[in-house]
Curated annotation (Swiss-Prot):
Compartmental location: Cell inner membrane
GO molecular function annotations of the record: aspartic-type endopeptidase activity
Any one Pfam family match given in the protein's UniProt record, by short name: Peptidase_A8
Species in which this protein is naturally found: Haemophilus ducreyi (strain 35000HP / ATCC 700724)
Protein name: Lipoprotein signal peptidase
Amino acid sequence: MAKQSGIKWLWLSLVVITLDLFSKYLVVERFELYESINILPIFNLTYARNYGAAFSFLADHSGWQKYLFLTLAIIISFILANVLRRNQIDQKRENMAYALIIGGAIGNAIDRAYRGYVVDFFDFYWHIYHYPVFNIADVAIVMGAGLLILETFLDKKKKSD
């Protein structure tokens, strides 16, 4: 019997996309732009718009970056979906990582295509120093990248044993 493909992990991408888009919908519907609600002494929910990439990279350009980031998200998602298709279903950490990255990339791409920008709202700070505002899709991408790094170290350790 043939082994099952890792493509079945795309369910996780759908969960990320759903949570991401729903959270952004709630923020846009209930907050004014730049409105902030303090949740903890180091954390606010703040409605911000990001016209660029991570940390608002290229946000101050004339609009071409929207198409660049959309194209990159689509290409990366297709490449990673192909990797999932080739992986075995039991490669859990690696498949989970790719699915998280795909979900985050598509969540932000949908936002960018629909609105022309990405809605961000998680605002962590210490005194007057604010970390760049981000969203659930960004968290998924970072978690996926972190899992890939972890998998690399664990794989090296396993091979050396």
